[in-house]
A protein has these predicted regions:
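Short, charged interaction patches at domain edges and termini
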Residues: 1-17, 57-65, 69-73, 117-151
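Generic hydrophobic/packing signal
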Residues: 80-82, 115, 119
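Mid-chain, well-packed structural core segment of small domains
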Residues: 70-109
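Small/polar-rich, solvent-exposed N-terminal microdomains that initiate assembly or binding
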Residues: 1-59, 63-64
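Hydrophobic alpha-helical segments of small multi-pass membrane proteins
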Residues: 77-79, 113, 143
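Broad gene-expression machinery/nucleic-acid interaction feature
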Residues: 49-51, 75-77, 139-141
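Short amphipathic alpha-helices in soluble, non-transmembrane regions
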Residues: 11, 107-114
Length: 151
């Protein structure tokens, strides 16, 4: 199985375990995790869902034996696309004020931590949030890596 597909399965498993948390407002959906590309007919804003896209970036030989790579460092990219209404919340705090997402604390970091703890993926670069003017979505991008040993 390819790296992006393995990550897709792992992230899907995390979502299935955690999506009942009321904080996620039904915006986390295991069917909205994609590897390689998002189908053209999928629009996170219309679905009011968070879309997660995984891509493979590189495989770099790291350890050689008998003139053959025995280990490679795999790098993958994970992007989180948020529906443009995800900053509004029907949830209220004790004072009746709306509770908003902290994208990193509530969604991205727990998923990245899960991938690190379960499969040994380490975050290399990424984070920060940007706004896509074409889709009117907030998104973030992370690169993660791990060693793949063939011995």
């Amino acid at each position: 199985m390819a790296i992006a597909e393995e990550l897709q399965q792992d992230i899907t498993a995390w979502i299935l375990k955690n999506k009942s948390n009321p904080l996620f407002l039904d915006e986390l959906d295991e069917e909205q995790v994609y590897s390689y590309g998002v189908p053209k007919d999928v629009n996170g804003n219309k679905l009011n869902k968070i879309i997660i896209l995984i891509r493979e970036i590189s495989l770099q030989p790291n350890l050689y034996g008998s003139n053959h790579a025995q280990e490679e460092v795999a790098t993958a990219q994970i992007q989180f696309f948020y529906p443009n209404e995800s900053d509004t919340s029907p949830l209220k705090d004790d004072n009746g004020n709306p509770v908003y997402y902290d994208y990193y604390r509530d969604i991205e970091k727990p998923i990245l931590d899960y991938l690190h703890d379960k499969e040994g993926w380490s975050r290399t670069i990424g984070g920060g949030h940007d706004f896509d003017p074409d889709t009117e979505q907030v998104y973030s991008t992370y690169h993660i890596k791990k060693s793949v040993n063939y011995l």
